[in-house]
């Protein structure tokens, strides 16, 4: 059985202040996109795991096996399984590759063994793997509240195009939050104008990302785009309405810039419950 494991963008992220437990209260917009990994699952004589395209992923202690262990504990099903993962989402890119793989694994196991677990049950298991893992059981577009674990599904799909720009080095979320200053937190509650409040903290740690954002803004100058950081990075993205591509002048210019800059083009996708995300590896 084969399943698409989509990347996730934080279209915006507002820091609303530090809580009594030491964590920051946030409001963020999650969006699943058509760029992602491919997971394959089969029953086997013994547990096995094969990773393609990325040797940095741990074989024995990754989010897929964590989900497998949780599923087995919850259902009592311990049949050996074989996982094969084709990785496209870079490790530490801020695109929630590990969280997406974990959620996809839970869904896949539920399908494979026909256990009939509800989305709510799967979401509850997903919470034990990662803060944003439950998001993937939404429609594919949602608000993240609290520390990001409270997911409010949004039904509308933003018709935008995203161009992703990866970095060779990731940013740990804990490191980004450790250097947050009170002045970084949003004063406005107007989500229409929200940006990523983690940008300045991350840029204090990574001057190269700040310079790369400036380079992208200069490169895309003359086209109505937004350039931002997703989550705590280290992926930068360019966002623009897909309608621009119907303008021949813009369309030609956009394709030239993408070819020159090495960006990866992707689009928003939705999940049609009770199915999983459509297998779209290209936008």
UniProtKB/Swiss-Prot annotation:
ATP binds at residues 90-100. Pathway: Isoprenoid biosynthesis; isopentenyl diphosphate biosynthesis via DXP pathway; isopentenyl diphosphate from 1-deoxy-D-xylulose 5-phosphate: step 3/6. The keyword Protein biosynthesis does not apply. Keywords: ATP-binding, Isoprene biosynthesis, Kinase, Nucleotide-binding, Transferase. Pfam families: GHMP_kinases_N (PF00288). The active site is at residues 8, 132. It catalyses: 4-CDP-2-C-methyl-D-erythritol + ATP = 4-CDP-2-C-methyl-D-erythritol 2-phosphate + ADP + H(+). InterPro entries: GHMP_kinase_C_sf, GHMP_kinase_N_dom, IspE, Ribosomal_Su5_D2-typ_SF, Ribsml_uS5_D2-typ_fold_subgr. The keyword rRNA processing does not apply. One of its GO terms (biological process) is isopentenyl diphosphate biosynthetic process, methylerythritol 4-phosphate pathway. Its EC number is 2.7.1.148. Disulfide bonds: none annotated. GO terms for molecular function: 4-(cytidine 5'-diphospho)-2-C-methyl-D-erythritol kinase activity; ATP binding. NCBIfam families: ispE. Belongs to the GHMP kinase family. IspE subfamily. This is 4-diphosphocytidyl-2-C-methyl-D-erythritol kinase. It comes from Chlamydia muridarum (strain MoPn / Nigg). The lineage of its organism: Bacteria, Pseudomonadati, Chlamydiota, Chlamydiia, Chlamydiales. The gene is ispE.
């Amino acid at each position: 059985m084969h399943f698409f494991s989509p990347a996730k963008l934080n279209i915006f992220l507002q820091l609303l202040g530090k809580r009594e437990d030491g964590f920051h209260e946030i409001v963020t917009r999650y969006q699943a996109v058509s760029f992602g990994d491919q997971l394959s699952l089969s029953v086997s004589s013994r547990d096995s795991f094969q990773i393609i395209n990325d040797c940095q992923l741990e074989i024995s202690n990754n989010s897929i096996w964590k989900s497998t262990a949780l599923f087995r504990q919850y259902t009592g099903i311990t049949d050996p399984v074989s996982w094969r993962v084709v990785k496209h989402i870079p490790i530490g890119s801020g695109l929630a590759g590990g969280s997406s793989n974990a959620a996809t694994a839970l869904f896949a196991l539920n399908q494979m063994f026909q256990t009939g677990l509800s989305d709510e049950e799967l979401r509850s298991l997903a919470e034990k793997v990662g803060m944003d893992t439950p998001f993937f059981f939404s429609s594919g577009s949602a608000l993240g509240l609290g520390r990001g674990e409270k997911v409010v599904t949004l039904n509308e799909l933003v018709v935008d195009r995203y161009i992703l720009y990866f970095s060779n080095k990731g940013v740990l979320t804990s490191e980004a939050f450790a250097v947050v200053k009170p002045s970084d937190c949003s004063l406005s509650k107007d989500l229409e104008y929200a940006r990523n409040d983690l940008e300045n903290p991350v840029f204090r740690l990574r001057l190269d990302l700040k310079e790369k954002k400036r380079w992208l803004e200069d490169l895309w100058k003359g086209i109505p785009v937004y350039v931002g950081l997703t989550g705590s990075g280290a992926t930068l993205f360019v966002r623009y309405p897909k309608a621009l591509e119907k303008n021949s002048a813009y369309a030609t210019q956009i394709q030239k810039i993408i070819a020159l800059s090495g960006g990866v083009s992707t689009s928003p996708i939705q999940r049609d419950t009770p199915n999983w995300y459509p297998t779209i590896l290209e936008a």
